[in-house]
């Protein structure tokens, strides 16, 4: 039986950049890795409040951390005169339990939140928690993404759908979705809906078209690094 590979990890270093960019010696690697996990979990909890689509962590040679937060609500994330951002950084320091660490948080505006797989998954999960139909929630997200320029969208919701005793999966797909073509610019994300009858899992794949030339791939990676 074939196993499905994560589309993001499948494309890291080819058409997508890694979510953590740093180098460390053996004795510091595990410490840095655990800090990265804490940072990702910290911003995961703020995803719905600030519409956070992705988090990228970078470290320099002095181990100073720069966190790039891609958000669709840039104004509310920064706050008046950057006050809210300062509070978020302070809470992040407390989470890491390391007051000496140098950490900066930079916010990047998401131009097309309708095409962001993470935000789509969270939108579907939010509607499921509001007891809306899982069919309507998925179809609405797919139609919205296709209207805004996606070439293909696939969604799956798994769990006790409509509260039935036996868990099952139901999904929809429209447009092209070449998951094993590395040139295909595919975003993948998951989300969890906590309902009264249990947890539902949401998976979303968004195809943004095929990258024809190597120069296009290099341009995407350079643009991501500049951001």
Swiss-Prot record:
Entry GO MF terms: mRNA binding; rRNA binding; structural constituent of ribosome
GO cellular-component term (any): cytosolic small ribosomal subunit
UniProt entry keywords in alphabetical sequence: Ribonucleoprotein, Ribosomal protein, RNA-binding, rRNA-binding
A GO biological process held by the record: translation
Similarity remark: Belongs to the universal ribosomal protein uS3 family.
Subunit structure: Part of the 30S ribosomal subunit. Forms a tight complex with proteins S10 and S14.
Protein name (database record): Small ribosomal subunit protein uS3
Species this protein is from: Mesomycoplasma hyopneumoniae (strain J / ATCC 25934 / NCTC 10110)
